[in-house]
Amino acid sequence: MLRYLTAGESHGPQLTAIIEGIPAGLKISEETINVDLARRQGGYGRGGRMLIEKDQVQILSGVRWGETIGSPVTLCVVNRDWVNWQEKMSPHERHRDDKIRVTRSRPGHADLPGAMKYNHRDVRNILERSSARETAMRVAVGSVARAFLASFGVTVSGFVVELGGIKAERRGLSSDRLRELAAKSELATYDPEAEARMKAFIDSVKDAGDTAGGVVEVVVTGAPVGLGSHVQWDRKLDARLAMAVMSIQAIKGVEIGLGFETARRPGSQVHDEIYFDSSRIAHGEATGFFRKTNNAGGIEGGITNGEEIVIRAAMKPIPTLYKPLSSVDMLTKEPFEATVERSDVCAVPAAAVVAESVVAIEIASAFLEKFGGDSLAEIRRNYDGYLDYLRSF
């Protein structure tokens, strides 16, 4: 079982994550995690904070000489902007200053419902934790999960497939080629022509004091048949993936495979027909069963079927606008324009990295549940035995 917790506020001293369930013997490094953290901070349309924070992870426990040792792994990322917030975010009562309270809630954020739920008269106490800054730690945890999956030939990749209504075209490209193109893109997309139009759209909404949303896609290749289960609702892998992706700030919809389009088509155009070719095993495939289409997105009945897992998520435009929306002061009940916090114009490329990370965590967790052991070597023996079984099925 793989589980993790994150802690920390956006302008606090640091962000922290504790991961439990990573087996002994996995090679991980701060340098590798930092590459993924940099990917999260990049992208066209990001805000001024990215110029301040250059995230660098520190591994504080669970790793010795470059390998996990089986105990909980602790990761932290220091907030460089903390130096400017030491008194505003101090844990000490002597620094309390009611004059700096934030009382004007921003539409679209957790500000007002959070303040009402926790009985706060300062929405700073809500917005600091609800901020997408927290996703830095989920990317760090996801980097560890991706390293684990990579040791078994499983890759997890995130892309921007739509932004401001402009769609990227895949044009029959392989998953490897998609990753190559997206890695060169400022918008994490694989369609250079669409990228140019997406950038122009971001520029136009920025000039208007507005923000832009989009759609991200995560593709998992190499996952074996049999991850997840049909036997209980909370063990269905598609349900777990949907929850993980929906938990990302500003995500308002998730679909797997053909998703919502399945509701518009007859069943004959939706379900993936099953074929068998024994020669596939001789060519290195895990099983002779295969599909010619993948409308299911690699999951049927909550269980992986051996095809690529495909998840898409809709990200709303960031609700912090430089041309603020109307709101109401929490204390005086007077109408005001909402508070403007430093923010991005478009964070869809970052959402692709975060979605990739949370999907990797869920796939790694399901993998460990299926093939679990205390060390990487033990899990590999279990996995190899399962692959032998599949070939004979």
Curated annotation (Swiss-Prot):
Organism: Geobacter metallireducens (strain ATCC 53774 / DSM 7210 / GS-15)
Cofactor note: Reduced FMN (FMNH(2)).
Stated name of the protein: Chorismate synthase
GO biological process: amino acid biosynthetic process; aromatic amino acid family biosynthetic process; chorismate biosynthetic process
EC number: 4.2.3.5
Pfam family membership, one: Chorismate_synt
Enzyme class: lyase
Subunit and interaction comment: Homotetramer.
